[in-house]
Amino acid sequence: MRSLDRYAIFILLACGLLWRPCLSSVPMPCCPIDSKKDVSGLPSVFEVKEIFFNYPQTCNYTNVAQFTYVPQGANVSTVVCANGFNLMSFILAVLQRVFEKPHNMGLLAENINKIRTDYALNFTAVNSESSRFNVVPVGRNGKVVTTTRVVKRSARSGSGAPPG
């Protein structure tokens, strides 16, 4: 199997083989994109575990997406807010390079194209700005809710609880 085919299948698996779970499956789907984030600090594509896209109506036609990754050798996952247009275009470019696509992969590409077109047709200066989602979520106990969580126990940490 060609490495690009394996890469595309990885993306398909990252979306759980079904389109529906990839859409709006996160508690806070509308998030601010950190445009000042150093690109070199982004994870390897092979560290990405989940990719989440939103329906256009979810965030009032602001195209934000999220992906979850676990750095190699770490035991916590982190959620990153991303430009939905960029992430959709990247995945579509990878899917277009796969020669023998499974049926689900073709459906995934078709649905991403439909959603991306819907966003593009409703694109305005107002909905191109994600900073309005810059809200700090507070839990019932009054503490700030974070997006980092333990995904497996570490032999060194003992309890498996996050530090702090």
Swiss-Prot record:
Q: Which InterPro entries is this protein grouped with?
A: Herpes_gL_rhadinovirus, Herpes_gL_rhadinovirus_sf, HSV_GL_alphagamma
Q: Does the keyword Membrane apply?
A: yes
Give one GO biological process term: fusion of virus membrane with host plasma membrane
List keywords of the entry alphabetically.
Fusion of virus membrane with host cell membrane, Fusion of virus membrane with host membrane, Glycoprotein, Host cell membrane, Host Golgi apparatus, Host membrane, Membrane, Signal, Viral envelope protein, Viral penetration into host cytoplasm, Virion, Virus entry into host cell
Subcellular localization, as worded in the UniProt entry: Virion membrane; Host cell membrane; Host Golgi apparatus, Host trans-Golgi network
GO CC term, one of those recorded:
host cell Golgi apparatus
**Membrane disposition:** Peripheral membrane protein
| Pfam families according to UniProt | Phage_glycop_gL
Signal sequence range:
1-24
Please state the protein's primary subcellular location: virion
Quaternary structure, per UniProt, is: Interacts with glycoprotein H (gH); this interaction is necessary for the correct processing and cell surface expression of gH. The heterodimer gH/gL seems to interact with gB trimers during fusion.
* Purpose of the protein: The heterodimer glycoprotein H-glycoprotein L is required for the fusion of viral and plasma membranes leading to virus entry into the host cell. Acts as a functional inhibitor of gH and maintains gH in an inhibited form. Upon binding to host integrins, gL dissociates from gH leading to activation of the viral fusion glycoproteins gB and gH.
The entry's family comment says: Belongs to the herpesviridae glycoprotein L family.
Q: What is this protein called?
A: Envelope glycoprotein L
> What does the record give as the organism's lineage?
Viruses, Duplodnaviria, Heunggongvirae, Peploviricota, Herviviricetes
